[in-house]
Amino acid sequence: MDYLWIMIGSALGGAARFWVTGFVAEQTGGIFPWGTVLINVSGSFLIGFFGSLTGAEGRFVVGESARLFVMIGLCGGFTTFSSFSLQTLNLMRQGEMIRAGGNIALSVVFCLLAVWLGHVVAVAINQMKGA
């Protein structure tokens, strides 16, 4: 049943991301990815807020299915940046500043390299004759 809640949350998060990024692009002219920035920041806020509010030391107790729905499903579908942010915050809260910094540096660098590499490969495939 947990998979069902995660799938529903992911679908809702993905649809929300699509709508928000489109709406923000229409409002701002799409010159800068403000929609994505908004998605990443708000998703990070949501996972940090909900995770802390409903965690072991939280004020509210919710079932594991609810946490999976919101934190993995909804936030995961909305943005994967929220998971990265929560993991980095947890490292910092544990005093693991070097690991937190490493997580930040590696995530940003490798994600940028991966998107660049994906772009390069796609351009190469697009330029192949007969494609």
Swiss-Prot record:
GO-annotated cellular components:
plasma membrane
> What are the protein's UniProt keywords?
Cell inner membrane, Cell membrane, Ion channel, Ion transport, Membrane, Metal-binding, Sodium, Transmembrane, Transmembrane helix, Transport
Give the transmembrane ranges. Answer: 4-24, 30-50, 68-88, 104-124
- Regulation of catalytic or functional activity: Na(+) is not transported, but it plays an essential structural role and its presence is essential for fluoride channel function.
Which residues are Na(+)-binding? 76, 79
Q: Which GO terms describe its biological process?
A: cellular detoxification of fluoride
Provide the reaction this enzyme catalyses: fluoride(in) = fluoride(out)
Instruction: Please name the InterPro entries in this protein's record.
Output: FluC
Q: Give the membrane topology.
A: Multi-pass membrane protein
Select a single GO molecular function from the record's annotations and give it. Answer: metal ion binding
One Pfam family this chain carries?
A: CRCB
Q: Where in the cell is it found?
A: Cell inner membrane
Task: Explain the purpose of this protein.
Answer: Fluoride-specific ion channel. Important for reducing fluoride concentration in the cell, thus reducing its toxicity.
Q: Which family does it belong to?
A: Belongs to the fluoride channel Fluc/FEX (TC 1.A.43) family.
* HAMAP family referenced in this protein's UniProt entry, alphabetically: FluC (MF_00454)
Instruction: Spell out the protein name for this chain.
Output: Fluoride-specific ion channel FluC
- Give the organism the record lists: Methylocella silvestris (strain DSM 15510 / CIP 108128 / LMG 27833 / NCIMB 13906 / BL2)
Give me the gene this protein comes from: fluC
